[in-house]
Amino acid sequence: MRIEREIINQFKAWKDAPNRKPILLKGARQIGKTWAMETFGKECFKYCVKFDFDRQPELKSVFQVTKDPKRLVKELALYQDQPIIAGETLMIFDEIQECEEALNSLKYFCEEAPEYHIIAAGSLLGVAVKKRKMTVPVGKVKIIDMYPISFKEFLLASDARTYEYIESLEEISHLPEIVLNKLRTEYRRYQVSGGMPEAVVALLDNQGISEVESALQDILDLYELDFSKYAEPREIPRIHAIWHSLPAQLSKENRKFIYKVIKTGARSKDYEDALMWLEDAGMIYRVYNISKPGMPISAYEETDAFKVYACDCGLLRRLAHLPATVVTDPIANYTEFKGAMAENAVLQSIMPLVDNQKPYYWTSPGTAEVEFVIQWGDEIIPIEVKAEENISGSSLSVYFKTYAPHHRMRFSMLNLQYNEGLFSCPAPLAGWLDKWMSIINNVYRI
């Protein structure tokens, strides 16, 4: 089964853009970066030529001899015995972290040969760049972050009719109950597989839950091997400990990251490098607290208070040893972690949409906490997340009374509605946040 990925549309827009720069594609392992590059190349270019610096280490010598992009093109074409024609060929530089000279060459392609289309990517690129003290040609490349398959992409593959219905909406009003129930069902299935392509395909091809679990476990095992292969020896046990503490961190009523959950007596200074490694690898999202929702929101970040979420809700479920049946048919004692899964899934949906304005969270001097706060244009918007239809709790009200935002949001399993500044949205539709904000600003802007 083919899953249509939205990143292909980003690539298509880049292909014909003026002042185009080479793309440097970032993202966690096993999210489909190579597939996306190759699919785009095959569908949108006459020729697609891939260079893999891990499997073809001899390629490094080509880049070590010259920095002239025109000469590089000639030698690469000879090496691969394929034509490289400006405007007709996509060049893919895969596993580019294995060749620093190839990474640096992107600068010269940008400056001296922008007519060539190049997309570069690598495994654990952020980790490798830091470890080897490599220089990324900032300003000379277009950096794109790729994420796991979103629920939006999942729904298109699993229930295209419901997807098209949501796409056709032009106003915020109650959805028919049949549509809402379909969304709830598919969303719970998505929380089982998460967005890792192998797991999604196993689920949607009806290969059985055992195959989904096997796919997720294989990825978790690969991540464990990455710790040993790419991290500094002294950091390996710390990275391992943080990663395996995520279910416990998120099971707490207060999901703030607590070092003593990792190990009694653990201190921040001992684990900061390990946290950074996981962030650089794209395996976790760190969401910081803010002292107040001011503009720009980044100015109010409190670096000593943060929550840590997994890059993918399916991996988080498997890491927690949570049976798939508990997610699709919740049981009584599935409570705190249900909330954690709901938050992780919503965060996963909005991450690709907030651009460089990363999400934060807010706490009052008392006990109120708003799960996420984002800067959207000239607004600071609080986002509350509820796992089901029970929306009791006063945190969003406390925030509203304190700061009086124009708009506030609640993602739950309730129906779509906008009332007096409160946008209530089914959590499955968080991935359409840009659509809802456009409607809100056009219709309800104060």
Q: What is each model feature region?
A:
Residues K33:
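Conserved lysine of the Walker
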Residues M1-D16:
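N-terminal pre-Walker A segment at the start of P-loop NTPase domains
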Residues I84-A102:
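Conserved P-loop NTPase "ATPase switch" module shared by AAA+ and STAND
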Residues I92, H117-S123, D145:
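Structural recognition of the conserved hydrophobic beta-strand(s) that form the central parallel beta-sheet
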Residues V201-W376:
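Accessory nucleic acid-recognition modules appended to NTPase machines
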Residues A36, F40:
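Hydrophobic positions on the alpha1 helix immediately C-terminal to the Walker A/P-loop
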Residues V129-S251:
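Interdomain motor-coupling "hinge/lid" segment immediately C-terminal to the ATP-binding subdomain
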Residues R55-G87:
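Short glycine-rich substrate-engagement loop in P-loop NTPases that contacts/grips substrate
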